């Protein structure tokens, strides 16, 4: 079976930490796949908030996630603090890619938990149409 392989781009645009909650733990006593999706969403929201943006106002555009891929590497457990590095990938007129490297430290060991990618589309809900990435948002993605 072919596996997803995510190569992280070079443009690092943020670092976020998210602690693992007991609600993130599944019947296997580790973080569930659905919780990883929520952690990635939380990281994106915190990254936007660093610049006073939200998914409803990214320098004037709303954001819609068009796709998501996750490459799981190791289990994560209650008590882990997940360090998420956010990277900017390919940018088009109306959309861009965000990549995420999720890791934690246990003892003195750095552990790669997962890599992920989301496709984000700029959207205007009033006209129900995609719109160009605002200039201020482009500057943030290209820093």
Role assignments for model-derived ranges:
Residues 2-67, 123-143:
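Hot-dog-fold acyl-thioester-processing enzymes
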Residues 61-62, 66-87:
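Helix-adjacent hinge/juxtasegments
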